[in-house]
């Protein structure tokens, strides 16, 4: 009888130890799964466009044409001859692009019209995240008569 009790205790002891190891294994698997989370997405590429001019007879985007990948951010920088802004012709963007541009343009003065940049080195970012591929034609509202136009091709 004594052997039966000791044998029974030994079996329960082994079972208890075995269940602890199983718990440790499942905890290790849970930690490994948590550590295997995907890496955060790389930040969007930022492409700079200078806004220049003498304030009276010439004004330009530099460069006036550029190609960017979908998801890029175009940073418009007032270098000289401001105030400047960036506006896009709603009838000169790809089909479905108006809503994507509205999402990518914060603090607008109107549909697809960014704010005035009045100070040197002031900038305004336009995100092309979710924007369909194609040509986006834009202009600077105060200097459109001086030919300040830009074409951005999104690939």
PLM segments and residue spans:
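Bacterial N-terminal signal peptides that target proteins for export
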Residues: 1-6
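Extracytoplasmic copper-binding redox domains, predominantly the cupredoxin/blue-copper superfamily
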Residues: 18-155
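C-terminal motif of bacterial Sec signal peptides marking the signal peptidase cleavage site
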Residues: 13-16
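Alpha-helical transmembrane segments
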Residues: 8-11
């Amino acid at each position: 009888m004594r052997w039966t009790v000791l044998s029974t205790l030994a079996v329960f002891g082994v079972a208890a130890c075995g269940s602890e190891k199983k718990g440790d294994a499942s905890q290790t698997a849970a930690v490994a799964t948590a550590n295997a989370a995907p890496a955060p997405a790389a930040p969007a590429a930022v492409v700079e466009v200078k806004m220049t001019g003498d304030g009276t007879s010439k004004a330009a985007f530099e460069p006036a044409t550029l190609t960017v990948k979908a998801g890029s951010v175009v940073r418009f920088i007032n270098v000289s001859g401001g105030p400047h802004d960036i506006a896009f012709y709603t009838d000169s963007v790809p089909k479905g692009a108006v809503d994507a541009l509205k999402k990518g343009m914060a603090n607008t003065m109107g549909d697809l019209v960014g704010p005035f940049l009045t100070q040197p080195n002031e900038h305004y970012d336009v995100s092309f995240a979710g924007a369909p591929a194609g040509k986006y034609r834009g202009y600077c509202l105060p200097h459109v008569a001086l030919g300040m136009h830009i074409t951005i091709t999104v690939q």
